[in-house]
Amino acid sequence: MSHRDSYTMYGTTILCIRQGGSVIIAGDGQVSMGSAIMKTSAKKIKRLAGDSVITGFAGATADAFTLFERLEAKLEKHPGQLMRACVELAKDWRRDKYLRRLEAMMIVADKSVSLIISGGGDVLEPENGIAAIGSGGNFALSAARALCAARDELSLDMTLEYIATAAMAVASEICVYTNNNIIMEKIEE
């Protein structure tokens, strides 16, 4: 499979977990170019809209920063309306010939909603408050779901930070494009 396939993102893992009014997004720090590790401490998580929105990206870095800028403009136009801002961004993404060629995905969250903006310009709200993207996304997603289920069924005291760290550690042990240098941002209720 080609690394230029816009629906398969290589080189990162981004995980979002929501519990009650709190949400956390975690990302690893590895930047890969082909089979070489170029950087181990990249920050793929960013705060927007006066720190009321957190977002993480997978895919081409320059493309992701283009999307960050566009999303920030949409959030300024529609303050406090994350869903609307993301839908407007997705509309632009689908209409604009330049944007359609961007190779990036994003997870975006505020105090009330978490969303995945796909490489095809779709806006998806994940079930169960857990979402993941990137090459290690399915590993982190599976681990986070298992940890949340165990926490709920056994009444265990696990924080969002603990679950995110443990799930990202699982992804970093399986996915060669993901490392264990985890950066997290959280919005508390």
Swiss-Prot record:
SUPFAM superfamilies according to UniProt: N-terminal nucleophile aminohydrolases (Ntn hydrolases)
Pfam families in the record: Proteasome
Catalytic reaction equation(s): ATP-dependent cleavage of peptide bonds with broad specificity
InterPro entries found in the cross-reference section: ATP-dep_Prtase_HsIV_su (IPR022281), Ntn_hydrolases_N (IPR029055), Proteasome_sua/b (IPR001353), Proteasome_suB-type (IPR023333)
Known function: Protease subunit of a proteasome-like degradation complex believed to be a general protein degrading machinery.
HAMAP family: HslV
Protein name: ATP-dependent protease subunit HslV
Organism annotation: Anaplasma marginale (strain St. Maries)
